[in-house]
């Protein structure tokens, strides 16, 4: 039984001679069937290994393609980051320039505005001065008009009866609107050159 349990390669020549022909054929066929089964199992294992290798090779090819695509995207993103960084630097420089320009412009505007306010104050002071001068001149003209007005009329109760010469009568103070260019003062000069009765010494 122990010899039957082992293979033919484990039997000695005496044990094989002691066995019958039929037993040897039976053991040989059994070992051949076992070897065929092992070969079939090995073939199946090889097929499974080949299938797994093909799957792994396909995954490797897909990973290579994905790696190439990711590398291309990485290059694009790196270029985009470089471009955005340069644009950011350019924007910061432009912002600093605009800030400097705004500071200088606001300073210039404040200076111009201060000058304008100063000029406006000077003009207002000059305007008030001119208004006072105009009021004084107007009062002077009214006073002169009241002083010289009665002399151009008829004489009073103790007078000579004849009024002064027409050229002695002074026109009102200020420029006179000539209208058509005629003059009623008897002046021999140009119609535009009219005397002003603004001072008794005239």
UniProtKB/Swiss-Prot annotation:
From what superkingdom does this record's organism come?
Answer: Eukaryota
UniProt-annotated stretches for the region Disordered: 148-202
For bias kind Low complexity, which ranges apply?
180-190
Locations of Gly residues compositional bias? 150-162
Check the record and name the InterPro entries matching this protein: CCDC85 (IPR019359)
Give tissue specificity per the record. Widely expressed including liver.
Its chief place of residence is nucleus
Question: Where, subcellularly, is it found?
Answer: Nucleus; Cytoplasm, Cytoskeleton, Microtubule organizing center, Centrosome; Cell junction, Adherens junction
Question: Which residues, by range, are in coiled-coil regions?
Answer: 43-90, 118-147
Q: What else is known?
A: May be the cellular homolog of HDAG. Overexpression inhibited HDV replication, whereas overexpression of HDAG reversed the inhibition, suggesting that HDAG may assist HDV replication by forming a complex with DIPA.
The annotated subunit structure for this chain is:
Interacts with CEBPB. Interacts with EURL. May interact with CEBPD. Interacts with MCRS1. Interacts with TCF7L2; competes with CTNNB1. Interacts with ANKRD26. Interacts with the beta-catenin family proteins ARVCF, CTNND1, CTNND2 and PKP4.
Query: What does this protein do, in the record's words?
Result: Functions as a transcriptional repressor. May inhibit the activity of CTNNB1 in a TP53-dependent manner and thus regulate cell growth. May function in adipocyte differentiation, negatively regulating mitotic clonal expansion. Plays a role in cell-cell adhesion and epithelium development through its interaction with proteins of the beta-catenin family.
State what protein this is by name: Coiled-coil domain-containing protein 85B
């Amino acid at each position: 039984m122990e010899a039957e349990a082992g293979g033919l390669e484990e039997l000695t020549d005496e044990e094989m001679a002691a066995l019958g022909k039929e037993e040897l054929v039976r053991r040989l066929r059994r070992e051949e069937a076992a070897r065929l089964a092992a070969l079939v199992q090995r073939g199946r294992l090889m097929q499974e290994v080949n299938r797994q290798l093909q799957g792994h090779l396909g995954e490797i090819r897909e990973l290579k393609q994905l790696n190439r695509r990711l590398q291309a995207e990485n290059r694009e993103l790196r270029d985009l980051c470089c471009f955005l960084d340069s644009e950011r630097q350019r924007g910061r420089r432009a912002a600093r320039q605009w800030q400097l320009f705004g500071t200088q412009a606001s300073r210039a505007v404040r200076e111009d505005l201060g000058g304008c306010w100063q000029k406006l104050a000077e003009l207002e002071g000059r305007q008030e001065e001119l208004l006072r001068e105009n009021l004084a001149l107007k009062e002077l003209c009214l006073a002169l008009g009241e002083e010289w007005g009665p002399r151009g009329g008829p004489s009073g109760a103790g007078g000579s009866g004849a009024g002064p010469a027409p050229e002695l009568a002074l026109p009102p103070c200020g420029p006179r609107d000539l209208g058509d260019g005629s003059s009623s003062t008897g002046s021999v000069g140009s119609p535009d050159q009219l005397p002003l009765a603004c001072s008794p010494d005239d």
